[in-house]
Amino acid sequence: MDSHLYAIVEELPPAWRPPSAPSGPSVALTRVAGLTAVTSPVERTPAASAPALARHDTIVASLLHVGAVLPFRFGLVVATADLPGWIAAHAPSLRASLGQVRGCVEMDVRLLRLHCAHAVGLACPACAGGTPDADGLRAVGDRLIEQAGVARWRYRSAAGAQGNAAASVAFLVPRREVAAFLSRIAPVASRAQGIAVVPTGPWPPYSFAPPVDRLPLAPAAGLGGVRTAGGGAPAPRPRAADG
């Protein structure tokens, strides 16, 4: 039997219960040295179906107000018998990562290109110069970073994405400062030319959790190690630029 990891947390309230669901695997807790792994028992690495992904996100989101939560992307699996030893082996890295996100949430600000519906010869002033290029998007991202008032951020270009998605900036924001953060970036949103600035969140700090390949995942003596969905493919890497 294996365990599919949702998150590792500190200070999990005794009254916490996973969100109810009519179907899907049960949720189990494994406590080791002050850390709690939130998992589900599985017989194999789960397929990334829409219901499975939605259930994963719902469970992780239910941990948003825990003191410190280290969320994992879908598909991280360890052998259940090895889970306590795996946590113990990686406790220093896990605690360091939890310390970096303690009391914080992720706010993701999406930058969307705006396209006017005018005829070719009647372009409006806002889009007369064409849609913003990569430098223009990054300039808006830089203004957001300057105004955000937070120390940690990650900028990501959405090159090749469908639709008008162009870029995004993830910010690690203290939970109590979300409203102030939104107020600080509002002037940037109102002045952006040809770009819609769309804040989303708060979310669990996925963008600030270390990717699987950044944790020391080589199995220690006697441990079964870790694998991920997709034939061992690593979890998504952090965004291109980091504050």
List PLM regions with ranges.
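An interfacial alpha-helical scaffold signature
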Residues: 1-243
